[in-house]
Amino acid sequence: MYTAVAFQVASTINIKLSKQQLAHQLLFQDSDELFYQVAPEKFMYLFHYGIVSFFNMNPDETAQLIKEIEPYCVEMIPADMSEAISVHIVENTLKVDFEKVVLPEVNPEMIRLVMLNVSQSVALDAYS
C-alpha cells in the first residue's frame, strides 16, 4: 500500500522559479503545476495555488522537500491542512473508493491524477 498526501503550504508557489531551480525529474508541467519523480516510485506535485502533494514518502522526506521548495513559496502556511488517500496496487484492477484508490500498477500518469485529486480536495477545504 502507498499513500498520496497533499498539504497547503503557502498562498502561492512560484512555478516558473521552481521549475528553474529544482533538480528532480520533471514528468509533467503546465503554467500552474509541476509534477516530479523524486526517486523510483516517489513523486512530488506542486501547484501555483500553494498546494504540494507527495506520493510514497515518509514524513521526514516530505518535510525535507517542503524545505526545498520554501524559497519559491509566498506566505508560507503551517502544513496543518492536509488530505491523504491510500493507493493499492492490484494487477488488472482500477477502482476508486472514498478513502482508497486501486490501480493496476505504479504508473506515473495514474499517480499524477490521484495526486491532482487529493490536492484539489485540500484546495477546496482551504477556500471554502
Describe the residue ranges of each PLM region.
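Structured inter-helical modules in multipass membrane proteins
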Residues: 109-128
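Short Lys/Arg-enriched alpha/beta "domain-start" segment
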Residues: 1-109, 113
